[in-house]
């Protein structure tokens, strides 16, 4: 999973001045600020109003999932699962339904039910319903990560078909959304997982160059992710496959990065 992909922001239901009097709106705001413990507390307060109990449980569940992702504390995952199970999503608006489905996918992923998680995330990607560009980036990363985990223990023939699927979707994403850092990263990562060393190298270079499309911090995050992938994965793999020195390949990568530094044009 890419380190740089951010949390999926929850939709805000009220204006900021009302937060002090609206525990549900406050819980959503705290979640979006990554104050997950405080978000859970506010969500529990909001749950006292029966008509808002399901929405409050959704915020709490997502907050517990983020806490689990950071701490790996089993109680956080259990609490998230308990809240997701008691939600009745029938009255949710489309955006809340999407948040609920993503929460289900994340819980399945953390339960190591990777194939089921990928299926859930795929339903979100296929729907194109109420999904912002940022939300799609995150779900796309979850989907690819789940398939990657599902594929690793499989026989080689089965793994190949999984990574072909990932590469195909990432190519489609880049054609439709050239700014997608997740697609640029996974195009290289999936090629590497297939043992397609040249395509992995080429895709990493292409992703580095097109990182400017992601812009600012996101572009920098994509370059950092690609650099780790190349140095820790693609270079050693390619060195073994081609009998080239890892030091030589790392030097070639460093030279490439220097030629395509984002600020290189400013120095000429």
Model-predicted regions and their roles:
Residues 9-18:
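Hydrophobic h-region of N-terminal signal peptides that target proteins for export
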Residues 162-193, 198-268:
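Eukaryotic alpha-helical solenoid repeat scaffolds
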Residues 64-76, 106-116, 143-159, 193-201, ...:
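Alpha-helical linker/edge segments of TPR/alpha-solenoid repeat scaffolds
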Residues 109-197, 202, 206:
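Extended amphipathic alpha-helical interaction segments
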Residues 52-68, 95-106, 134-153, 182, ...:
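Amphipathic alpha-helical repeat scaffolds of TPR domains
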Residues 30-44, 71-85, 112-123, 155-169:
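Helix-turn-helix repeat elements of alpha-solenoid scaffolds
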Residues 18-70, 74-79, 253-268:
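N-terminal leader/linker segments that initiate helical-solenoid repeat arrays
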Residues 46-55, 84-99, 126-139, 171-177, ...:
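Flexible helix-coil transition and linker loops at the boundaries of alpha-helical arrays
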């Amino acid at each position: 999973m890419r380190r740089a992909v951010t949390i999926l922001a929850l939709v805000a239901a009220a204006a900021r001045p009302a937060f002090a009097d609206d525990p549900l709106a406050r819980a959503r705001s705290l979640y979006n600020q990554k104050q997950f413990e405080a978000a859970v507390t506010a969500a529990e307060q909001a749950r006292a109003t029966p008509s808002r109990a399901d929405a409050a449980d959704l915020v709490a569940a997502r907050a517990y999932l983020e806490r689990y992702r950071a701490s790996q504390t089993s109680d956080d995952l259990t609490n998230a699962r308990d809240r997701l199970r008691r939600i009745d999503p029938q009255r949710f608006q489309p955006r809340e339904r999407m948040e609920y489905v993503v929460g289900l996918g994340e819980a399945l992923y953390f339960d190591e039910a990777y194939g089921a998680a990928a299926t859930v995330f795929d339903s979100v990607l296929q729907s194109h319903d109420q999904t912002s560009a940022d939300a799609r980036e995150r779900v796309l990363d979850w989907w690819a990560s789940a398939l990657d985990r599902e594929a690793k223990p499989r026989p080689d023939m089965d793994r190949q078909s999984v990574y072909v699927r990932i590469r195909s979707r990432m190519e489609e994403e880049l054609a439709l959304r050239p700014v997608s850092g997740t697609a640029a990263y996974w195009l290289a990562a999936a090629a590497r997982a297939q043992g397609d060393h040249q395509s992995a190298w080429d895709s990493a270079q292409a992703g580095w160059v097109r990182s400017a499309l992601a812009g600012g911090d996101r572009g920098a995050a994509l370059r950092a992710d690609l650099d780790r992938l190349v140095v820790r994965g693609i270079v050693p793999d390619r060195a073994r496959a081609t009998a080239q020195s890892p030091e030589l390949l790392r030097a070639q990568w460093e030279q490439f990065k220097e030629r395509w530094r984002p600020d290189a044009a400013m120095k000429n």
